[in-house]
Amino acid sequence: MDDFFPVSIQRCRSYDLHCVQAAVERSLEPWGGFSAFCRRGGRILLKPNLLFGKPSETAVTTHPIIVEAVARLALDCGAQVFLGDSPPLASASRNAEKCGIGEVAERLRIPILEFHQPTHNGWRHPQKTYGIATPAISRVLQEMDLIVNLPKLKSHQQLLITGAVKNLFGCVPGRRKAYWHFKCQSRIDAFAGMLLALYEKILPGLTIVDAIVGM
């Protein structure tokens, strides 16, 4: 990726819904607000981190208040909102229920999608830096007008940090992710290159990182 992407950072001291909503709205002001990213009737996928079914206090997953704040902005724009992820073991709906995001989805009537069906094709890193094919992603992503990436800021054993790029690894269906972890376990550069290629393929229209409490 040769181009620089603009970034907005806002201080938010708690997971109070009003505070989070205000911080998100302030962060998007330079682009004209959330409505600049979506259209009425458009299909929007919210992609949080639903790695494990742990309570939000453990900071393993994206906090449900972050999801609710962004979902409300999308709904206010008249968009059709969906939520999805592909945890390595349990289902997205099960993990969402355990971490509190399921309650938000139910209350706001947002369907939770499982990323089971992959696209038939993989691809290679555009710059062919590492010569490693990248995995197929869920077909669900091809049905969306906008993907809103909602990662949790966390440390990571292989890459040191999990954020906007690494969160999209969850778009690879099911246990296929374990194969790619194994395939690249001794080649951190290859793993990082694969993730960058994955990001370039999916290219979310907006990323909002939950960094109020990291892990």
Q: PLM features: what roles do these ranges have?
A:
Residues 1-215:
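N-terminal and secondary-structure boundary signal
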